[in-house]
Amino acid sequence: MNQIINDNYREFLKKLRERHLKKRKVKDKNKPIAVWMQDDIYRDFSIGKSLTIILRTEGCYYAKEGGCLMCSYLMDSSPEKITAENIINQFNYAIEKYKEKIKDLKDFSVKIFTSGSFLDDREVPKEARNYIFKKLSEFDNLKEVAIESRPEFIDEDKLNEIRKYLDVNVEIGVGIESFNEEIREKAINKGITNEQIIRAIELAKNYNIGIKAYLLIKPLFITEKEAIYDSISSANKCIELGCSRISFCPATVHKGSVMEFFFNKNQYRPPFLWSIIEILKEVKKSNPKALIMCDTSGVGSERGAHNLYNCKCNKLIKERLERFTLTQDINVLNVECECKNIWNAYIEVENKNIVPLGDERKLLL
């Protein structure tokens, strides 16, 4: 019976994904999705500039089969074949755009992302990866390199490939999301195990390569209180295992995702910013030497993490979260607003209700 349910579930996810993928538009295959430079924090806690390059690829193999319930990054992928030459051209375009600024910097880092895994040969061919690594190695002021990958692609061959060219700090971002396997599978549909994650962390250590743990704050099907506890416990576990940094990702409702399906039915609400503050404070207090970050994409919007919608504290807290990421000073998170009482009441009512609640405004209608 369980197998029948699982098969039907996967088929539903795949059809939902395919329906939205038909809306993708053909874009220039020789230009990246985006490229920008910003202030960032290095692994040694110093502040510098990072160049972020988001490559356009054919997308995450796992997402094509249905994928994670909150994700629609596959929509940024190309509906057409992307070759190694295309990816090399995208990288060169990004470097050329910022080469003059890079020359003037004492040091800088480069972050190279895709809509999936940089270490998946189907998405980024080895030829393109090696070209990128070789070109990066030519910068005397390069301090760090960051890429992303699912853990199943982190192996001896790929790590040797990296170290063949790069002797700087390297981090591989892994979407661990939660260290609770039941939550990761049923509420996220991640398709990876704790065993795979631990193996990737240990393997990377052998090459002095860090693992940056992406942790999702408030996946589907759990309450606000459960989300707070899960994020704190997951971060503590990742730090215990030796992850080089923790990057919290407050859930944002992506168009075309399963999360949006429940959001539209008012059966899901993105996390409160008060919850995020509590998570960051607790994790940093317990692990003062750990590097803790928080993504603020979507923060303050209706589809992103927010307190009372349109409350003035949303903008303030977003700024404080960004400052915390750069300074690692939990004192900047000391914020107060009357709407905090609504958050406390929401958690209390939701716990009595047992099942997760939706938007508090719609609940009062």
UniProtKB/Swiss-Prot annotation:
GO terms for molecular function: 4 iron, 4 sulfur cluster binding; catalytic activity; metal ion binding. InterPro entries: ELP3, Elp3/MiaA/NifB-like_rSAM, RaSEA, rSAM. [4Fe-4S] cluster binds at C60, C68, C71. SUPFAM superfamilies: Radical SAM enzymes. It comes from Methanocaldococcus jannaschii (strain ATCC 43067 / DSM 2661 / JAL-1 / JCM 10045 / NBRC 100440) (Methanococcus jannaschii). It comes from the Archaea. CDD domains: Radical_SAM. This is Uncharacterized protein MJ0550. Residues 45-289 form the Radical SAM core domain. The keyword Transferase does not apply.
